[in-house]
């Protein structure tokens, strides 16, 4: 079964079980599926800037943390155990720019709430497994995002514990 058909089957099961409400129409569903999960402009810009500085990383690298927990950060520094996520303001409910949609609130409110809860769970799972988690909002200035990643890597490379700085 292809990846696309397995996603469609999983979506159909979720709709049938009531886990996720069915889309209102096929056109809207198609539009939402076209939204990128990875390779967004903020991700590409951050990756490019880090690469130019000489940092090497894995992109969308699947981490298996045990107990069936799988996580796929946007940027992963495997040797240093640093996971970087670039979060979209809408999808991850940015406190500055995240807005609740006014249409189909019955659908969006629980969905966005689940996204935020999943982010918390992922952060905790990674931390428990000894990983350092960095979350960058898509609206953050590129130089600030680069500085946050570089500072974390620098501190870890030189034996400083940065966990109390969050």
Swiss-Prot record:
GO MF annotation list: endonuclease activity
InterPro entries xref list: DNA_mismatch_endonuc_vsr (IPR004603), Restrct_endonuc-II-like (IPR011335)
EC number(s) on file: 3.1.-.-
Bias kind Low complexity: ranges: 7-17
Pfam families documented for this protein: Vsr
CDD domains according to UniProt: Vsr
Positions of region (Disordered): 1-41
Biased segments, Polar residues type: 28-37
Keyword field: DNA damage, DNA repair, Endonuclease, Hydrolase, Nuclease, Restriction system
One GO BP: DNA restriction-modification system
Function: May nick NaeI sequences that contain T/G mispairs resulting from m5C-deamination. If unrepaired, these mismatches can lead to C-to-T transition mutations. The very short patch (VSP) repair process counteracts the mutagenic process by repairing the mismatches in favor of the G-containing strand. This enzyme is an endonuclease that nicks double-stranded DNA within the sequence GCCGGC (C-methylation site unknown) next to the thymidine residue that is mismatched to 2'-deoxyguanosine. The incision is mismatch-dependent and strand-specific.
Similarity field: Belongs to the Vsr family.
Protein name: Type II nicking enzyme V.NaeI
Lineage: Bacteria, Bacillati, Actinomycetota, Actinomycetes, Pseudonocardiales
